[in-house]
């Protein structure tokens, strides 16, 4: 059983919703990423999504786009991202880490090399935003062969066929993009999410995490009744970008602790 699957199984037994924060590797300080990851894990993050910086992050809004630009300006590439995961693993061997990014950095690094190095670094899952499931079965199989979970996106516009395609090859969890558009945009409609998730679960048997538009504890708590996981990205990146180096990890940890408390106070709807 993968580290991600084991985490969700444990949480299911506890009737708790997973908390999955996202940060961009190397932002806001190249030497702070591991400290932020450790602080978030210590504060109650169940899985950490670590964004690989890319110059054209088409699915991301201005907050994460700027974070990518800042990280790239510091020289953060795939090699540096994997080194951060290795460093994190020296202190934490239990919290799953998912690399989230785009095809270009993976292919530029070399797919075979990426899979091997991600495994050796201690990565648990990979989400490539612009790899549609129907076109990357070989890549998904290669990841699974290295005990890495291939993770995919679904959206309000996803067809039944897309859900079936994702359900066939996804492992770990599926990330449901709860809003049309880019990350950090719009207002989250929890009723619409609650209507959509049963449709997804007809085809997808791994846990379903919900992201995009989650900015505070109240929204996260509302989603805890229907989602297996809550994913928060833009709000965290926004909080961290304004912090000085000496306090950035603590601020990240404090925010995660507030979300964790909200999720744990609303367990009645979590699926057994």
Swiss-Prot record:
Pathway: Amino-acid biosynthesis; L-tryptophan biosynthesis; L-tryptophan from chorismate: step 5/5
Gene3D superfamilies, per database record: Aldolase class I
Reaction equation(s) it catalyzes: (1S,2R)-1-C-(indol-3-yl)glycerol 3-phosphate + L-serine = D-glyceraldehyde 3-phosphate + L-tryptophan + H2O
CDD domains: Tryptophan_synthase_alpha
Enzyme class: lyase
InterPro entries named among the record's database cross-references: Aldolase_TIM, RibuloseP-bd_barrel, Trp_synthase_alpha_AS, Trp_synthase_suA
EC numbers: 4.2.1.20
Signal sequence, start to end: none
Alphabetical UniProt keywords: Amino-acid biosynthesis, Aromatic amino acid biosynthesis, Lyase, Tryptophan biosynthesis
GO molecular function: tryptophan synthase activity
Active site per the UniProt annotation: 49, 60
GO terms for cellular component: cytosol
The keyword GTP-binding is annotated on this UniProt entry: no
Protein family according to the UniProt entry: Belongs to the TrpA family.
Function, as annotated: The alpha subunit is responsible for the aldol cleavage of indoleglycerol phosphate to indole and glyceraldehyde 3-phosphate.
Quaternary structure annotation from Swiss-Prot or TrEMBL: Tetramer of two alpha and two beta chains.
HAMAP family assigned to the protein according to its UniProt record, in alphabetical order: Trp_synth_alpha
Protein name, UniProt field: Tryptophan synthase alpha chain
Gene: trpA
């Amino acid at each position: 059983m993968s580290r991600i699957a084991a985490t969700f199984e444990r949480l299911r037994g506890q009737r708790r919703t997973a908390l999955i924060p996202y940060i961009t590797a190397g932002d806001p300080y190249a030497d702070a990423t591991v400290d932020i990851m450790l602080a978030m894990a210590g504060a109650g993050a169940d899985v950490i999504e670590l964004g690989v910086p890319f110059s054209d992050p088409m699915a991301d809004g201005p907050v994460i786009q700027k974070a990518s630009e800042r990280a790239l300006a510091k020289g953060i590439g795939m090699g540096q991202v994997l080194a951060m995961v290795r460093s994190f693993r020296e202190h934490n061997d239990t919290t799953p880490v998912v690399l989230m990014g785009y095809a270009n950095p993976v292919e530029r690094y070399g797919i075979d090399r990426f899979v091997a190095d991600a495994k050796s670094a201690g990565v648990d899952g990979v989400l490539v935003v612009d790899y549609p499931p129907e076109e990357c079965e070989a890549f998904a199989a290669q990841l699974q062969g290295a005990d890495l979970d291939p993770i995919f996106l679904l959206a309000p516009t996803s067809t039944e066929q897309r859900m079936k395609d994702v359900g066939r090859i996804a492992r770990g969890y599926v990330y449901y993009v709860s809003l049309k558009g880019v990350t950090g945009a719009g207002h989250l409609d929890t009723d619409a999410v609650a209507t959509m998730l049963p449709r997804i679960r007809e085809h997808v048997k791994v846990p379903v995490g919900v992201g995009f538009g989650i900015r505070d504890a109240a929204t996260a708590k509302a989603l805890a009744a229907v989602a297996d996981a809550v994913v928060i990205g833009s709000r965290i990146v926004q909080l961290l970008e304004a912090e000085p180096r000496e306090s950035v990890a603590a601020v990240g940890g404090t925010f995660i602790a507030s979300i964790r408390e909200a999720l744990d106070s609303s367990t009645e709807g979590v699926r057994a």
